[in-house]
Swiss-Prot record:
Belongs to the methyltransferase superfamily. METTL16/RlmF family. NCBIfam families: PRK11727.1. GO terms for molecular function: 23S rRNA (adenine(1618)-N(6))-methyltransferase activity. The gene is rlmF. The lineage of its organism: Bacteria, Pseudomonadati, Pseudomonadota, Betaproteobacteria, Nitrosomonadales. It comes from Methylobacillus flagellatus (strain ATCC 51484 / DSM 6875 / VKM B-1610 / KT). This is Ribosomal RNA large subunit methyltransferase F. Specifically methylates the adenine in position 1618 of 23S rRNA. HAMAP family: 23SrRNA_methyltr_F. Its EC number is 2.1.1.181.
Amino acid sequence: MSQRSLPDEKSGLHPRNRHRQRYDFALLVEAHPPLAAFVRLNQYEDASIDFADAQAVKTLNQALLKCYYGIAAWDIPPQFLCPPIPGRADYVHCLADLLAAGNDGNMPYGGNVRVLDIGTGANLVYPIIGQKEYGWHFVGTDINVEALENAQGIVAANPGLAGAIELRLQRNVGAVFSGVVQESERFDLTMCNPPFHASQAAAMAGTERKWHHLERSRGKPTGKGVRRVRSGRMSGNRLNFGGQAAELYCEGGEEGFISRMIKESAAVGAQCLWFTTLVSKAATLPAVYRSLRAVDAYKVKTIDMAQGQKKSRFVAWTFHDTAGQRAWRRQHWRDV
């Protein structure tokens, strides 16, 4: 086997991200012994798992959530999205920085900070990390009843989450904020990881590209055996290494979803300090900025993020001017 020198830290991750270091599999197995069944030496003689194995990835997530966030019970149903924890944590930490920038550099902690997670999914990872790291109160929304039932099960199985995370069903699949944001409530942040693709065919093509990348990274040829593995993994509704249709694609894809979100945000602009959304494709940004100009957002920020060679970013916008942001802070963050 060949050997290579690996950096101690993963490049690009936020300084407060608990996952900047390479995975300590001995520590993770100690926290969650079932992970041991999936740990093996890769071609570089480093401990790892097979990231193409959905059960291995889910078990790694269970270990990470238990070891670093004290989540004793976490699971997702088959065919739901199993998110990478380090990248999800980065978004949360960057949101904390966004709030701190408007609070004289002081990080707002505690349940006075309210966050709306659009499309929280069955995994509930954003609210878990945000609550455990900063004590924030979360409202998670989704159009999928099964996803919310599973998320509610996670809350119920982990007493520390009770009272800090509430879940709401979005009954209108074409709406984002309408129907879930109540008239009298306010949010300091909204966050969202929007569907990436515009169709099932595009989602399947994206999955094929991921499989090809994984095979290359594992040193495997792209021949008959690889096609046979793909055929087995792609059976049924398994797309993109897990994910329900609404998690992976929607009308208009990422650009269409974000454009609808921006248009709706204007109607509840007084009730939220900062709206934010991940933007996976840099090519989507011009359309996002056009939509924001159309609703006359007061301020727009684009925050770049990276995990190794994977580049991403989120866009944040507010309808509150500078005086309005100061008034918001005085009114809602006095005890933060």
